[in-house]
Amino acid sequence: MKRRKLTARNADINRLYEESVQCTVFEVSFINKLFKRYNKTKCKSLREDFCASALISSEWVRHNKDNIAIAVDLDRTMIKEAKNTALSRLSSEQQKRIKICYGDSSKFNTDKVDCILATNFSYFVFKQRKKLIDYFKHSYKQLKNRGIFMLDAFGGYEAHQLLEERTKHKNFTYVWDQSSFNPITHEIKCHIHFEFPDKTARKRAFTYEWRLWMLPEIQECLKEAGFTKVDVYMQGWNEKKNEETERFYKVTKCDADPAWVAYLAARK
């Protein structure tokens, strides 16, 4: 049966977001590797903050029959979406090992877990230092002893610029649009657009109003919140192919690249 062509009218923007932005197999593998490296044991329980469609949590319970996941988000529409998609993606046994909860990630209490995940720069929504530290303190309390809090961040001098970046996928083009940036406050406004072969588009399918936090600030706030050690992992570079690799390495120094993405691992 011929696959229907994607257009602005029939596209599911949540599925397009997942395909464009998220790489759950990598992130689940990365969590497992880091946790075992730090603690010499397996990571069993995961909490996914700002979970949206809870894609990582779903992959987590699929990955291992002993894994459990808790997914938290403040958007009721996305929580409903996450529950519906979990039903279609997971077996009945796997569904028993995932909890999808409506709540404020900075305040919502759950069972303590081995790892808390805040990715896709979601915590950038906290624009004041106190609010960011309050969220980090809450995350610290929600972790088991020797637990890990994993976050991502982006930067580089292009992060301060107004720009549009296009990435072509099989049936659509993903557009990352940095539409405004205030150097004084580091407030940044970004949009995600989707463009289709028939020349239609879903403009501003997603909009983000953040503070662009810098790595030293994030590390300082994590330590102020109580975390004993914070490591930074940067993506490797293949000199022959002149492109990024899929591996991330723990670093204390890196080049002043125009754009970069990093992971931070904060240990309790």
Predicted segments with their positions:
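A short acidic, Gly/Pro-enriched loop at the edge of an enzyme's catalytic core
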Residues: 106-116
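Conserved SAM-binding strand-loop segment of SAM-dependent methyltransferases
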Residues: 90-105
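Conserved SAM-binding loop of SAM-dependent methyltransferases across substrates and taxa
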Residues: 53-66
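SAM-dependent methyltransferase
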Residues: 150-221
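A short glycine-rich, Lys/Arg-flanked "PGG" loop and its adjoining helix->strand segment in the class I
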Residues: 131-145
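C-terminal lobe and adjacent flexible extensions of AdoMet/dcAdoMet transferase-like proteins
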Residues: 212-268
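Conserved SAM-binding loop
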Residues: 82-83
